[in-house]
Structures are given as C-alpha cells and as structure tokens.
Amino acid sequence: MLDKVKNVIVVLSGKGGVGKSTVSTQLALALRHTGHKVGLLDIDLCGPSVPYLLGLEGSDIYQCDDGWVPIYTDESKTLAVMSIGFLLKSRTDPVIWRGPKKTMMIKQFLQDVKWDELDYLIIDTPPGTSDEHITVMECLREVPCNGAIIVTTPQGVALDDVRKEITFCKKTGIKLLGIVENMSGFVCPHCTTCTNIFSSNGGIELANLAQIPHLGTLPIDPRVGILAGTTASVLSELPESSTAEVLKGLVQHLDTLTAQG
C-alpha cells in the first residue's frame, strides 16, 4: 500500500558487495535528518542487511487488518523499516526459496505493508538483474516511482555489471536518477587523508558515457563503519566528512527532482 507515499526511490547495484545497503540506509537516515518522513524497504531476500545496519535485529513485526506494520526507529515515526530479515530467526538463516515464492514475497512487501504518510520510500533491492527486479518494476508501474540510483565501486568488473543494470533500467522503463561511486579511496581515521587504493573515477566515466548524473563519490571511511548497528546519521555524527557532503548533495538532488514533479 503505497498510496500515502509521495516519492519512491529504488537503489540498485549490478554486483553484490558494493555497499548498496549501506548507501540505502545512510540515504534514508540523511533524508530523515533533513526533516523528511522516510520508509526503508529491504527486499534483498537472500541477503537482508538493513536490520543489522540499523541495530534492529530481533525486532518483531506483525500484521493488522490493513497489512504488515513496519518497525519504527523512533517514537515520532520519522523512519519506518520493513525487511525479510525481521521474519528470520537468525541473520545466518538462509532463504531457500524458488523463484515463484520470492516473487510472491516481494509483491507482498510492495503491496501489503501499511506505510503511514511518507515523503520518501527507499527500496533496497538485491544485486543483479533477476526475477526479483522484474517483479519490483512491474509492481512500481502502478505507483509514482521517481527512479533508480545505481551504486557501484571503481573496479572494472563492478562497472561492467553496472552497464547491464543501466540497460535493464532502460528496457524496463525506470528512470535513472544517477550513479553513486562507493568505496573510492580510503580515509585514514587518524589524519582523514584519502588515499586511492583501487582505481578511481570509474563511476564518473560511466555516468558520462551513459549520459546520466554522477551523484557523488564515497570513500571507505572506518568512522562511517562504526555507525553500523545504530540509527545515527553521518550528517549528525560526521558532518564535516566527505561522506556527509555527498549525502547532503544527494538529498538536495532528490528534493529538487521531486519538487519539479
């Protein structure tokens, strides 16, 4: 039930392990920090990370007459979260489902969660281009989906998979809002100097090639990693960091896009 949701943003990655869930989570927290009411929907069925990243593991969800009730991280209900992880007994429990059951569960999460009034719903998807993604796109055709943000790392193998993701989005008709390059450089926790330990600027080059916006470059910052397991935003805890600057720019970019309709 997305009738009370003003804006829907899908976060995609062509490859696993690029930090997509961390970007989704910190984007949701940044939007909340700037005064928005936000929902975060984790439909990465085989690798749900959001409950861990927000310190919500062990939370119980229940159903009311109107559907699933999400987990709220605060009394003001400014951040609502739903994940398959809440239905598992342990983070190590595998989800051994065939395609049709996965499709059914994703449809349930997209159609049967009782969201309150939300300014933004961030949808954290599985990596790749699979049946799950097709199901998401089909369901979102019935609601005003603003578009997709693609997360990548600078390495060539990740960028190759992002090219497939871009093609997938174009074929399924979802608007590409831009690319975020993650894990580009390492920030020393002592002197905050950023050193490129992998290749760099691959996300920028790919964005230029695909003619879509480059939304920012995020480094590996151990200080950001320490925030995992809490609902603390980088914007409040590390306001001077390069990660905070990128997230501020991303929030402003989304606010501008949504204001334009």
From Swiss-Prot:
Q: How is the cofactor bound?
A: Binds 4 [4Fe-4S] clusters per heterotetramer. Contains two stable clusters in the N-termini of Nubp1 and two labile, bridging clusters between subunits of the Nubp1-Nubp2 heterotetramer.
Report residues binding ATP: G14, K15, G16, G17, V18, G19, K20, S21
- Which InterPro entries does the record cross-reference, listed alphabetically? Mrp-like_CS, Mrp/NBP35_ATP-bd, NUBP2/Cfd1_eukaryotes, P-loop_NTPase, YlxH/NBP35
Subcellular location(s): the record lists: Cytoplasm
Binding site residues for [4Fe-4S] cluster: C188, C191
- What domain of life is recorded for the organism? Eukaryota
Q: Which UniProt keywords apply?
A: 4Fe-4S, ATP-binding, Cytoplasm, Iron, Iron-sulfur, Metal-binding, Nucleotide-binding
Q: Which CDD domains match?
A: Mrp_NBP35
Question: What cofactor does its activity depend on?
Answer: [4Fe-4S] cluster
Q: Name one GO molecular function term.
A: ATP binding
Q: Which GO terms describe its biological process?
A: iron-sulfur cluster assembly
- Taken from the record, one Pfam family name reads ParA
Q: Which GO terms describe its cellular component?
A: cytosol
Q: What is this protein's function per UniProt? A: Component of the cytosolic iron-sulfur (Fe/S) protein assembly (CIA) machinery. Required for maturation of extramitochondrial Fe-S proteins. The Nubp1-Nubp2 heterotetramer forms a Fe-S scaffold complex, mediating the de novo assembly of an Fe-S cluster and its transfer to target apoproteins.
Quaternary state and interactors? Heterotetramer of 2 Nubp1 and 2 Nubp2 chains.
Task: Family membership, please give it.
Answer: Belongs to the Mrp/NBP35 ATP-binding proteins family. NUBP2/CFD1 subfamily.
**Alphabetical list of HAMAP family matching this protein:** Mrp_NBP35, NUBP2
Q: What is this protein called?
A: Cytosolic Fe-S cluster assembly factor Nubp2 homolog
